[in-house]
């Protein structure tokens, strides 16, 4: 029985050591010469922000099949600092003040 508990530990240790050897940094400094390399804070400010969509119905729609949509909406509103919330008829989470 000890074999079944010791063998997975040995496999994990060997896998970690193998990944550590593969993740070792290279001797050269190829990043500085790469054309997509961004250097400095000023260059980061020039980059365009990524656009993303906000889906307000995700809390109420996705969790409605397990009947936890109102609880999830209330928890979401509590995390936002509100006093709670509920899902309305359009499946949108509405937070209280």
From Swiss-Prot:
GO terms for biological process: defense response to Gram-positive bacterium; humoral immune response; innate immune response. Its main location: secreted. GO terms for cellular component: extracellular space. Keywords: Antibiotic, Antimicrobial, Cleavage on pair of basic residues, Defensin, Disulfide bond, Immunity, Innate immunity, Secreted, Signal. CDD domains: DEFL_defensin-like. Residues 24-57 form a propeptide. The keyword Transferase does not apply. It is found in: Secreted. Coiled coil: none annotated. InterPro entries: Defensin_invertebrate/fungal, Scorpion_toxin-like_sf. Constitutively expressed in the anterior midgut and is up-regulated by blood feeding. Not expressed in the fat body or hemocytes. It comes from the Eukaryota. Disulfide bonds join 60-87, 73-93, 77-95. Residues 1-23 form the signal peptide. It holds the Pfam family Defensin_2. PANTHER family: DEFENSIN. Belongs to the invertebrate defensin family. Type 1 subfamily. Antibacterial peptide active mostly against Gram-negative bacteria. Its activity is enhanced by lipopolysaccharide. This is Defensin-2. It comes from Stomoxys calcitrans.
């Amino acid at each position: 029985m000890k074999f079944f508990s010791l063998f997975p530990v040995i496999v994990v240790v060997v896998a970690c050591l193998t990944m550590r050897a593969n993740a070792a940094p290279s001797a050269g400094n190829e990043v500085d010469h790469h054309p997509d390399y961004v250097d400095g804070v000023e260059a980061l400010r020039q980059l365009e922000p990524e656009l993303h969509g906000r889906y307000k119905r995700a809390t109420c729609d996705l969790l409605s099949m397990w009947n936890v949509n109102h609880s999830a909406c209330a928890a979401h509103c509590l995390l936002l600092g509100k006093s709670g919330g509920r899902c309305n008829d359009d499946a949108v989470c509405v937070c209280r003040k």
